[in-house]
Amino acid sequence: MRQLIKAGIFTALIVVGAWISIPLGPVPFTLQVFFVFLSAYVLGKKYGTLAVATYVLLGAMGLPVFANFKGGAQVLVGPTGGYLFGFILGAFVIGLLAEKKESFAWYLASGVAGLGIIYALGVFVLNFYVHDIRKAISVGFVPFVWFDLIKLVVAALIALRLKKLEVER
């Protein structure tokens, strides 16, 4: 029950992270991915993925939980839909790997693997809208990757600290 409550809290944090948005062309800059990382690191593959999948499902049902207060299935089939589905698969992979070993280097490696999945799906879908893979990469990857790597590092540090506090309790 405790893990379900934590998953619900992380779903809410992902929503808040989506609402903190700076429009940059077809893909806005948000804090969603930061909370996707954090949920996967802290909750692991099962509950981290549940938190992210719940977020995507709430948006698909029409609740305005996505970036720029958008919601509805049209967002999932739009230019940023690949990133949203990538969040689910990325959270699973990050959580799966993070459960194997609790170390900063391992968390970074698992985060990079998850981020790669998020970007691969995101750019793949975005390409269908911009009709040019180079443009999809230049607008859906290049402006964000360094910021997302910073978010990954911060999420890993926070997650390790939270886990240490939980063990000490």
Curated annotation (Swiss-Prot):
**Taxonomic superkingdom:** Bacteria
- Per UniProt, what is the membrane topology? Multi-pass membrane protein
Annotated membrane-spanning segments are 9-29, 47-67, 75-95, 106-126, 139-159
Provide this UniProt record's keywords sorted from A to Z.
Cell inner membrane, Cell membrane, Membrane, Transmembrane, Transmembrane helix, Transport
Q: Provide the GO MF annotations for this entry.
A: biotin transmembrane transporter activity
| Signal sequence, start to end | none
Q: What Pfam families does this protein map onto?
A: BioY
* Compartment(s) of residence: Cell inner membrane
Any one of the GO CC terms: plasma membrane
The principal location of this protein is membrane
The subunit field of the Swiss-Prot or TrEMBL record says: Forms a stable energy-coupling factor (ECF) transporter complex composed of 2 membrane-embedded substrate-binding proteins (S component, RibU, BioY), 2 ATP-binding proteins (A component) and 2 transmembrane proteins (T component) upon coexpression in E.coli. A stable subcomplex with both A and T components are also isolated. This complex interacts with at least 2 substrate-specific components, BioY and RibU.
Task: Relate the protein's function as given in its record.
Answer: Substrate-binding (S) component of an energy-coupling factor (ECF) ABC-transporter complex. Probably a biotin-binding protein that interacts with the energy-coupling factor (ECF) ABC-transporter complex. Unlike classic ABC transporters this ECF transporter provides the energy necessary to transport a number of different substrates. The substrates themselves are bound by transmembrane, not extracytoplasmic soluble proteins.
Family to which the UniProt record says this protein belongs: Belongs to the BioY family.
Instruction: Indicate what this protein is called per its UniProt record.
Output: Biotin transporter BioY
